[in-house]
Amino acid sequence: KFQSRMIVGFKKCLTAVGGCGGPLSRLLLKAGKSIFGDTSRVVRSGNWYGNDTAWRMVLDLNKCLFHFAGNGKPRTKPLKYCTLVDGIIAGEGDGPVAVDAKPCGVVVAGFNPVAVDTVCATLMGFDYRKLPVLKEAWKIENYPLVNYCPEDIVCKSNLQQWDRPFSQLQEREHLGFRPHFGWVNHIERSNIDPIPEKQLEL
């Protein structure tokens, strides 16, 4: 209650200050950023490479979705699932809120979210084995999310360079996405060059 009262009080104060003029309002915002940091440039939550809890939550929620019905009982039939990723104009950098647009002209689809995300991470220029949520998703034994190995994935594409088994896709050019600042230099595929920017124009 105290925290919510403080937030409401602060908003009222800012509203009153805003009525007094822009310079004072800007001064207060600048002071706030110097104390608390710019929201888009400060890691306040789990969005950094060392977080060892967020990926567990994501996988647990997916286990519940795929293996249990809404009433909490085990599913009698496997959940039918189709993943569609719109990467026509994707986002890179400080996501999911403050992304920079990245035109890629790519749509990815599949019937298993672990496989689709693994392929997407690879196309983006990331090593899925360095992303805990993907690396660990392939290892689950109790209530698994996927019943095959990454090497079993076969990608079908209208681009010859991506129309191949996943094991070969990992050795091909990628889209060269810039990761969130909390993940820079921790997830990139360093051995393969990105596709030149001019080839990504729509």
Language model segments and positions:
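Extended, low-polarity segments enriched in aliphatic/aromatic residues
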Residues: 1-202
